């Protein structure tokens, strides 16, 4: 796949095949039996799905050499976030609705977040 250095496409495809086999080995349970029996089968199926998911993550980490989850985006402190609607209220179609406005000054209306 484009953009990766040191990884061959064959290894990645092999990893994907292994993961596909794992998921295919755990089909959804059949809707037969009493309510309690169906519930127990679904509970066991979900537990197996969680295990398969964890094993799949380990396989991908091994083949790709990096975690599968993206790096978390750092947000500014809540004290610096404000809603600024003085310029263009009501014209949300022109600009992105809810675009963040960051103000340096602190507003007393927000408070410090500490209960007295």
From Swiss-Prot:
Residues 18-26 are annotated as: Homomultimerization. GO terms for molecular function: DNA-binding transcription factor activity; RNA binding. Asymmetrically arginine dimethylated at one site by host PRMT6. Methylation impairs the RNA-binding activity and export of viral RNA from the nucleus to the cytoplasm. A motif (Nuclear export signal and binding to XPO1) lies at residues 73-84. Pfam families: REV. The modification Phosphoserine is found at residues 5, 8, 99. GO terms for cellular component: host cell cytoplasm; host cell nucleolus. It is found in: Host nucleus, Host nucleolus; Host cytoplasm. It comes from the Viruses. Residues 26-48, 90-116 are annotated as: Disordered. Keywords: AIDS, Host cytoplasm, Host nucleus, Host-virus interaction, Methylation, mRNA transport, Phosphoprotein, RNA-binding, Transport. One of its GO terms (biological process) is mRNA transport. Residues 36-48 have a biased composition (Basic residues). A motif (Nuclear localization signal and RNA-binding (RRE)) lies at residues 34-50. Homomultimer; when bound to the RRE. Multimeric assembly is essential for activity and may involve XPO1. Binds to human KPNB1, XPO1, TNPO1, RANBP5 and IPO7. Interacts with the viral Integrase. Interacts with human KHDRBS1. Interacts with human NAP1; this interaction decreases Rev multimerization and stimulates its activity. Interacts with human DEAD-box helicases DDX3 and DDX24; these interactions may serve for viral RNA export to the cytoplasm and packaging, respectively. HIV-1 lineages are divided in three main groups, M (for Major), O (for Outlier), and N (for New, or Non-M, Non-O). The vast majority of strains found worldwide belong to the group M. Group O seems to be endemic to and largely confined to Cameroon and neighboring countries in West Central Africa, where these viruses represent a small minority of HIV-1 strains. The group N is represented by a limited number of isolates from Cameroonian persons. The group M is further subdivided in 9 clades or subtypes (A to D, F to H, J and K). The RNA-binding motif binds to the RRE, a 240 bp stem-and-loop structure present in incompletely spliced viral pre-mRNAs. This region also contains the NLS which mediates nuclear localization via KPNB1 binding and, when the N-terminal sequence is present, nucleolar targeting. These overlapping functions prevent Rev bound to RRE from undesirable return to the nucleus. When Rev binds the RRE, the NLS becomes masked while the NES remains accessible. The leucine-rich NES mediates binding to human XPO1. Escorts unspliced or incompletely spliced viral pre-mRNAs (late transcripts) out of the nucleus of infected cells. These pre-mRNAs carry a recognition sequence called Rev responsive element (RRE) located in the env gene, that is not present in fully spliced viral mRNAs (early transcripts). This function is essential since most viral proteins are translated from unspliced or partially spliced pre-mRNAs which cannot exit the nucleus by the pathway used by fully processed cellular mRNAs. Rev itself is translated from a fully spliced mRNA that readily exits the nucleus. Belongs to the HIV-1 REV protein family. This is Protein Rev. It comes from Human immunodeficiency virus type 1 group M subtype F2 (isolate MP255). The gene is rev.
